[in-house]
Amino acid sequence: MKTIISIISLFIFTSTLLAQPLAEGRIVYDIKLGKDADPQMASMMPKEAFSWFKKGKSRFEMTMMMGMKNTTISDEATKTSVVLMDMMGMKYAIKSKFEDSNPETKKAMDEAKVTKTNETKIIAGYNCTKTIVEFKDKSGKSSKFDIWSTKDLAFSSKGQEGPMSKVDGAALEFSIAQGPLTMTLTAREVVREAVSDTKFIVPSDYKEMSMDDLKKMTGGR
């Protein structure tokens, strides 16, 4: 459960995709685990994730192990986000503000080394450029993230927590590491489609709580 909480925390910063030219639509991501991933763990992890965006709002959704559904809804206008967790029928909503960054994460990102390369490749039909973000965690261990982003969709990851805050444009491929587990998300397709406003509404059957409350409840730290 602690691993699940950590992954959820890391995914919060991926959730806000703000479209200008492409006013609304859906992105489908393929998820691959690193070659050193435990086979049993790998069998329980999701194979894809989805993101919907419309007028400054976004919804990032994936189904975790044991059927747990994790959804993050973000609103650029109010600078807020809410994580919806459905754990086998137990439903919780964890709200936060963009400015409420974890102090340790903020310090690491402020001191991060950002290398914007000239490497490019096409992802889901869009030209993407590679950015390398290197930083040290509280133990002093170095971590490196390769993020491929495009400006063709005029999305913005600025203001988010984590490595995404260092990238211009929309991230269409990125990796996330948590302990021995590495997940790489790559956009398979960007679909231009109408998105219902209900995608960005928190259902009434979710109980609101803080991330600290959730960690205490699940025995996490």
Question: Which ranges hold each PLM region?
Answer:
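Bacterial Sec-dependent N-terminal signal peptides
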Residues: M1-L22
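Extended soluble regions of mature proteins
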Residues: Q20-E99, P103-R221
